[in-house]
UniProtKB/Swiss-Prot annotation:
It is a single-pass membrane protein. Its EC number is 1.14.-.-. Heme binds at C448. It comes from the Eukaryota. The chain crosses the membrane at residues 64-84. This is Cytochrome P450 93A3. GO terms for cellular component: membrane. It comes from Glycine max (Soybean).
Length: 510
C-alpha cells in the first residue's frame, strides 16, 4: 500500500511539473526548444557517458539550438555551424567565459587559479597575451624544435625496437609518452621518463585519468545538494590525482627556486628558458601588471600538461585507427611521402607544407574525431541569439562533433576521405576557428592557445609512422573498433594494438 501511495505521489509530481513547465514556457520570453524536464534532475536522464552523441540526437529532433536543464543548471546546445557562429562570433562578448563551477575544475586548478578556466578579465587577458607572445608563441616553438626532434627520434626507436622483437605496440600508451615528454621538456626541461618504469606509467595514467574525469558528467556539479555526498566517487579520485601532481610540481618548483637563488650551474647548462623560467620571471617582476603566485604557476603547468598531452595523443590515435581501417588512404599517404621526402631520410617538420594529403588526413581526423567534441562557454549577461532569449549564467555547449558530421556541409560525412581537403580548393580550409563547420580547436578569444604546437606534433609523428612502418593488426578482419568512451578529449573505448613491420631503416638518421 505504501508503495502505491509513493508511486501515485511521484506521478502526480511529474504531471504537475509538466503542466507548470509548459505554463511557464508560454509566459516567459522565447527560449530555444526543449524536451520536458523531470523534477530535480532536469534532462540529465537523457545523457549517456558520451553526451556529444546524445546532444546530436536531440538536435535532430528539436533543432540546431536547444535548451536543457542539467539538474538545476540552464544550458543551451548549438549543433550547426550557423548556430556556432552566432554564439562564438556575433555574440562572443556575452559568451567569453568558461563554466568554472565544477568539482573537476576547482580541484585541478588549485581553487580556480588557472588560465584556461579563468573568467574573461584582466588576469585572463594577461595570460592569453603571455601565451601567444612567449609561452606558446612562434619564437618559443622554434626554440624547442630540437626538443620535438629528439623526442620523435626516441619514439621511432621505441617502435622500431618493438618491431624487431615482434612485440605489439599500444598506440595509446606510446602517444601519451611522446606528447607528455615534449610538453614536459617545454615546461620544465624534464621528461616524465625516469629509470623507474612504474613512475612513468603512473604519470601517463594521471594525465589520462585527469582528462577522462574532467569530461565526465558529475551529478554533483548539477544537483547542488548532492555535492557533499560524492555519489560517483569523482571527488576523491580528482583529489588523489591533484595530490599526486602536486607532489611532483612542488619538487620541481623547489628545485628551480634553489637554482635561481644560487645561480646554479644547471641554469647555465640550459640552452634557453623553458616555460617555468618565464613564469618565474613574471612572478618576480615587481613592475608586472599581474602578480603570479605559486598556485597560478602550478595551475598553469597542469593546464598545459593535461591539455597539451592528451589532445595530441588522442588525435594521433584516432588518425592511426582511420588509416588502418582505410588501407587505400594509408597507401596514398605513403606514395606522397616517398615522392616528396624519399626513402633516404626521415620526414621533418619542414616537409609538412609540401605534403597536402598528409594535411588532409589530419584535418579529416579532426573533423570526425575532434579532440574536444564539445566547446564549453557560459553567458556573462543576457543575449538574444537567433531570436531566442538566453539568460545570464546559461551554460553553452557547442557540439563540434556534430558540426563535423553535418551533411549540409560535408558530403558523405561519415566517410573518412582526406581528398575532400585537397580537391576543389579545399586546401585552404583551416582548423584554427575561421571556418565554423570545422572547429576542433575552438574559435575566437577562447580558441586553444596551443593549436600550433598540437599541429606540429601530430603531423610529423603521424608522418614518420606512415613513412617508416607497415602495421599488422591483431584481429580477425584487420579492422580496429571505432567506439568512443567518456572524456573531455574524445578517448577511444578500445586500444589499438599493432605489430610494426619496418618499411625503411631509420637507424642511419636516428
Amino acid at each position: 500500500m505504501a508503495f502505491q501511495v509513493l508511486f501515485i505521489c511521484l506521478i502526480s509530481t511529474i504531471v504537475f511539473a509538466s503542466i507548470l513547465w509548459r505554463k511557464q514556457n508560454k509566459n516567459k520570453t522565447l527560449l530555444p526548444p526543449s524536451p520536458m524536464p523531470l523534477p530535480i534532475i532536469g534532462h540529465l536522464h537523457l545523457l549517456s557517458p558520451t553526451p556529444h552523441q546524445d546532444f546530436h540526437k536531440l538536435s535532430l529532433r528539436y533543432g540546431p539550438i536547444i535548451h536543457l536543464f542539467l539538474g538545476s543548471v540552464p544550458c543551451v546546445v548549438a549543433s550547426t555551424a550557423e548556430a556556432a557562429k552566432e554564439f562564438l562570433k556575433t555574440h562572443e562578448p556575452a559568451f567569453s567565459n568558461r563554466p568554472a563551477n565544477t568539482v573537476a575544475v576547482e580541484t585541478l586548478t588549485y581553487g580556480f587559479q588557472d588560465f584556461l578556466f579563468a573568467p574573461y578579465g584582466p588576469y585572463w587577458k594577461f595570460m592569453k597575451k603571455l601565451c601567444m607572445s612567449e609561452l606558446l608563441g612562434g619564437h618559443m616553438l622554434d626554440q624547442f624544435l630540437p626538443v620535438r626532434q629528439x623526442e620523435t627520434k626516441k619514439f621511432i626507436k621505441r617502435v622500431l625496437q618493438k618491431g624487431i622483437s615482434g612485440e605489439a605496440v599500444d598506440f595509446g600508451g606510446e602517444f601519451i609518452t611522446l606528447s607528455n615528454n615534449i610538453v614536459s621538456r617545454m615546461i620544465v626541461s624534464q621528461t616524465s621518463t625516469t629509470e623507474d618504469e612504474n613512475e612513468v606509467e603512473e604519470m601517463r595514467k594521471l594525465v589520462k585519468d585527469a582528462a577522462e574525469l574532467s569530461g565526465k558528467f558529475n551529478i554533483s556539479d548539477f544537483v547542488s545538494f548532492l555535492k557533499r555526498f560524492d555519489l560517483q566517487g569523482f571527488n576523491k579520485r580528482l583529489e588523489k590525482i591533484r595530490d599526486c601532481f602536486d607532489t611532483v610540481l612542488d619538487r620541481i618548483i623547489k628545485q628551480r627556486e634553489e637554482e635561481r637563488r644560487n645561480k646554479n650551474e644547471t641554469v647555465g647548462k640550459r640552452e634557453f628558458k623553458d616555460m617555468l623560467d618565464v613564469l618565474f620571471d613574471i612572478s618576480e617582476d615587481e613592475s608586472s601588471e599581474i602578480k603570479l603566485n605559486k598556485e597560478n604557476i602550478k595551475a598553469f603547468i597542469l593546464d598545459i600538461l593535461i591539455a597539451g598531452t592528451d589532445t595530441s595523443a588522442v588525435t594521433m590515435e584516432w588518425a592511426m585507427a582511420e588509416l588502418i581501417n582505410n588501407p587505400g588512404v594509408l597507401e596514398k599517404a605513403r606514395q606522397e611521402m616517398d615522392a616528396v621526402v624519399g626513402k633516404s631520410r626521415i620526414v621533418e617538420e619542414s616537409d609538412i607544407a609540401n605534403l597536402p594529403y598528409l594535411q588532409g588526413i589530419v584535418r579529416e581526423t579532426l573533423r570526425l574525431h575532434p579532440a574536444g567534441p564539445l566547446l564549453f562557454r557560459e553567458s556573462s549577461r543576457r543575449a538574444v541569439v537567433c531570436g531566442y532569449d538566453i539568460p545570464a549564467k546559461t551554460r553553452l555547449f557547442v557540439n563540434v562533433w556534430a558540426i563535423g558530421r553535418d551533411p549540409n556541409h560535408w558530403e558523405n560525412p561519415l566517410e573518412f576521405r582526406p581528398e575532400r581537403f585537397v580537391e576543389n580548393g579545399k586546401s585552404q580550409l583551416d582548423v584554427r576557428g575561421q571556418h565554423y563547420h570545422l572547429l576542433p580547436f575552438g574559435s575566437g578569444r577562447r580558441a586553444c592557445p596551443g593549436t600550433s604546437l598540437a599541429l606540429q606534433v601530430v603531423h610529423v609523428n603521424l608522418a614518420v609512422l606512415i613513412q617508416c612502418f607497415q602495421w599488422k593488426v591483431d584481429c580477425d578482419n584487420g579492422k580496429v573498433n571505432m567506439e568512443e568512451k567518456a572524456g573531455i578529449t574524445l578517448p577511444r573505448a578500445h586500444p589499438i594494438i599493432c605489430v610494426p613491420i619496418r618499411r625503411l631503416n631509420p637507424f642511419p638518421v636516428v
